[in-house]
Amino acid sequence: MAALPVLAVTSGEPAGVGPELCARLLARDWPARLVVLGDADLIAARAAAVGSPIAVRHYSRGQAQAAGVLEVLHIPLAEPSDAGRLAVGNARYVLALLDRALAGCVGGEFAGMVTAPVHKGVICESGIAFSGHTEYLAEHTATPLVVMMLVGGGMRVALATTHLPLAAVSAAITRPVLEQTLRILHADLVQRFGIAAPRILVAGLNPHAGEGGHMGREEIEVITPVLDRLRAEGLQLVGPLPADTLFAPHTLAHGDAVLAMYHDQGLPVLKHASFGGGVNVTLGLPVIRTSVDHGTALDLAGSGRADPGSLYAAVELAVSMAEARARQPR
């Protein structure tokens, strides 16, 4: 019998909902060994505060898994943390969780990582430039390009651009970037989703996919040449498709993933279908990383009302991706 994959789950911003959501991982049986990274006392206290006390055991790599306890790789807080109240002094603690999870993934200790939400603002206030998990992990693995993909509602939606002003999107979609984005998406669908010959639906940038150049020429000058080049190599790419009809069920049924050109072209449909249960996946990294699709929810922290659905879905997807990768030929 194959050993269960071991996943690192970072508990995120200590003032947010991450610690209590991680404690609720004990409510399910998982086809994996889950190791929560964080301050063990904080996680136990936050679970007790919301009326769900748990048993915590400090994680050791050589130790056998135990039932009914939450394994925590203890990383101490820099200063005490109260639910709902950010503390700049804990910014480095939050990044230490990521650093340890990443080191474990790169070194083979963990099969992947699942990240609870962090608060970008408080990290930046501490004097550390930080724009998000995705960029941080890319920088620390020397990965030149990563691709953001959301999974939920029966859809996989990747983005050619992410957090850019709409006015900057067109200039950011170049032939080299689009080509590499599609290569990454294709490769990870094969290697980490177990889809032997993925079919990718590619959105146009402009209304009606440019209407033959009358509503913009990006489809003619950038998108179509890239698709033609990659089709010649055997990739199954459909498009550029008008985004207003791409998400119709009969169109989605013929694809394994969608590549949208910008954030608000692709994600509103997916979040409408899966809000609270979606998963953010970073493609192109040398490690598996999934994340919840929500923020720190400081207003809910400590109340016991935070929904664990997205964290559960992120763990489920990370397990599936780890299993698919393990099946790939060495």
UniProtKB/Swiss-Prot annotation:
It catalyses: 4-(phosphooxy)-L-threonine + NAD(+) = 3-amino-2-oxopropyl phosphate + CO2 + NADH. It is an enzyme of class 1 (oxidoreductase). It comes from the Bacteria. Keywords: Cobalt, Cytoplasm, Magnesium, Metal-binding, NAD, NADP, Oxidoreductase, Pyridoxine biosynthesis, Zinc. Substrate binds at residues 133-134, 271, 280, 289. InterPro entries: PdxA, PdxA_fam. A divalent metal cation binds at residues 163, 208, 263. One of its GO terms (biological process) is pyridoxal phosphate biosynthetic process. Its main location: cytoplasm. It is found in: Cytoplasm. Its cofactor is Zn(2+); Mg(2+); Co(2+). GO terms for cellular component: cytoplasm. Disulfide bonds: none annotated. Pathway: Cofactor biosynthesis; pyridoxine 5'-phosphate biosynthesis; pyridoxine 5'-phosphate from D-erythrose 4-phosphate: step 4/5. GO terms for molecular function: 4-hydroxythreonine-4-phosphate dehydrogenase activity; cobalt ion binding; magnesium ion binding; NAD binding; zinc ion binding. Binds 1 divalent metal cation per subunit. Can use ions such as Zn(2+), Mg(2+) or Co(2+). Its EC number is 1.1.1.262. The active site is located at the dimer interface. Homodimer. Catalyzes the NAD(P)-dependent oxidation of 4-(phosphooxy)-L-threonine (HTP) into 2-amino-3-oxo-4-(phosphooxy)butyric acid which spontaneously decarboxylates to form 3-amino-2-oxopropyl phosphate (AHAP). Belongs to the PdxA family. PANTHER family: 4-HYDROXYTHREONINE-4-PHOSPHATE DEHYDROGENASE (PTHR30004:SF5). This is 4-hydroxythreonine-4-phosphate dehydrogenase. It comes from Azoarcus sp. (strain BH72). The lineage of its organism: Bacteria, Pseudomonadati, Pseudomonadota, Betaproteobacteria, Rhodocyclales.
